[in-house]
Amino acid sequence: VRISYRVIAAVLAVLMSVMLAPAANACSRVTWLGPDGAVITGRSMDWPYSFHSHLYAYPRGLEQNGAGGINSLTWTTKFGAIVVAGTTDPEGPIDGIFDGMNEAGLVANLLYLGESDFGPAPADDRPRLSFAAWVQYVLTSFKTVDEVVEAFTDPAIYVVPINFGPGGAAKPTVHLSVTDASGDSAIIEYLDGKPVIHHGRQYQVMTNSPTYDEQLKLNAKWDNVDKNTDLPGSIQSADRFVRASYYLNNLPQTTDQRQAVAGVFSVMRNVSVPWGVGDPEHPNLSPTYWRSVADSTTKIYYFESALSPNIVWVNLNNINFAPGSGVRAVAVEENYSIIGNIDTELKPAAPVRFLAPPPNPPAPAAPGPGTSESDATGTTEQSKKGFGWWWIPVGLAVVAVVGALVRPLSRRPVEAATLAATRAPIAQVPPATPVAPEPTISDRQTSAADASSIQVTYENNALGEGEQDGTDKSDSVPD
């Protein structure tokens, strides 16, 4: 009986862990430091669904709003940038920026981190910035990693976590990597509401969970392994970290720019998740939709869609980032007709309207006599966490499994009594009398299968709609 109850507890623990697992991306990022100061950063974007990604060109001198709700951060762009923007909901508009490089060679990459915790909204009036605008703020405001680290060491800006995706089921648990043209890097994570920053040229690899300090410990045992060592090959974050570190360290120190870019792309493909492959029990492990490589030395930004055999790129040296030049964009994730240099494919577009928290949420009703606060507001602590619709079938599975395991235990009183009798002293055992055998209880199996297919349609965000929202502030690139 004890063993059975332990089995029940184990099953419940596993199922609850699945219920609490967030659907999120499992991306990877590396930075190659070559001879003569060459710096090239690559990343992969792994996700359960397409972001319908576009490349956007943002000019200098453009007024921006960080979509943070109350006390939302506003700023004027100091640097032009090429960024990857997409939809946080497959049926919604383009409302987030996840990756990119500015004209100074600063690169920013937003990746998933399950342990991320931005903390509760502050009671003071500090500026607030939507997590969907975090990359944009960094790339259009700073030139070096030192400047970024200084800006986020003192939490003068609150990064607002906003649930997104279908039904708002996805949690914005992310961390940020930044790399500049000198090769300096930083990993910025928010844990327990406070920024934790790893700053230095040595931080060349980043994946996902666990937290970065734990990733470094896990990777340490693989340092200095020879080329005959069998590397871990799963799609788990820790395994991707090991492979990325190993192959990055074994890339040739070439001065050939083509070979250098090819080397970084090859590492990113090695840690990518094949198309259509994932872990159904862990929705945070999803196929790779696209890869990017940003050359901070030549200022060329490359993009590769998993569904296209063509690599495209933008040379930032050829883009007009002058104030008043306007925002331009081109679809890249699902645009199969483009190839090679696409500088001229960038067409006028409206600026991205970033994902923002719901405006003016209704105040909860005061609880009456005999009414709890959760009854008055219509919420519970569990519903506040926003598990999403998918926990319902999992919850039913929990009930079914527990019922199947407990039912046989409750139907065995005769066996229990017989066992107790056999353990009693021999002198106390009465003469045996014939006992009719108890009817055998046949095993029962219950199974349930539920399959559904959701056809998601997507309407591309109209490019070129709306007027340019910006004012001229400067005619030159600041130092």
Give the location of each predicted region.
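Bacterial N-terminal signal peptides that target proteins for export
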Residues: 1-9
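Bacterial N-terminal signal peptides
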Residues: 9-19
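Compact, glycine/acidic-enriched structural inserts
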Residues: 61-76, 115-158, 327-336
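Extracellular Ser/Thr-rich, low-complexity/disordered mucin-like segments
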Residues: 369-392
